[in-house]
Amino acid sequence: MKLAPYILELLTSVNRTNGTADLLVPLLRELAKGRPVSRTTLAGILDWPAERVAAVLEQATSTEYDKDGNIIGYGLTLRETSYVFEIDDRRLYAWCALDTLIFPALIGRTARVSSHCAATGAPVSLTVSPSEIQAVEPAGMAVSLVLPQEAADVRQSFCCHVHFFASVPTAEDWASKHQGLEGLAIVSVHEAFGLGQEFNRHLLQTMSSRTP
């Protein structure tokens, strides 16, 4: 299938809020350390005034915070989800299947990913490095995709529909019962990883083009 529309829409959703793309990678790298990230820390890394950090985060309504106002989740999260993302013996979590395939390249770490088939509950797992996926179990694993909607809450509009499945046939059967989702498609986990790699390439190009 043609994945270009999904890449374009993902990039559009990330860039919809001015500054989100620039904030994303530093934030992910800090969250990958396994502890909450303060706005002051983020402002220092980005060399932004505190007001700019606050303005971008205010529009990124999916962002998760602890009781002290520190960031604990944006795609990668310290709160438990169905997508376990283990790096350097630290157990983190992701919002959706595609996040687990995208983030290793952005944070420069290999992750051991485990989850469950969204249709059957069967366990699924794989190892995701910045450049490849390995140890895919079961081997025929699939991923569901939808086109991101124009909504501030990307988690609700996109991530909640992007799952792992034990096989393509299982995923296609699930998709037949969820035809109301715009742009719903089923791809192999290898195709989904390729989409993630292409997304990362475009995202990093966009960031470098804005670097003075």
From Swiss-Prot:
Gene Ontology biological-process annotations: response to mercury ion
Gene3D superfamilies to which the protein is assigned, alphabetical: 3.30.450.410
Known catalytic reactions: an alkylmercury + H(+) = an alkane + Hg(2+)
Entry annotated with the keyword Lyase: yes
GO molecular function: alkylmercury lyase activity
Pfam family membership, one: HTH_15
Keywords: Lyase, Mercuric resistance, Mercury, Plasmid
Function: Cleaves the carbon-mercury bond of organomercurials such as phenylmercuric acetate. One product is Hg(2+), which is subsequently detoxified by the mercuric reductase.
UniProt similarity note: Belongs to the MerB family.
Protein name, UniProt field: Alkylmercury lyase
Source organism (scientific name): Escherichia coli
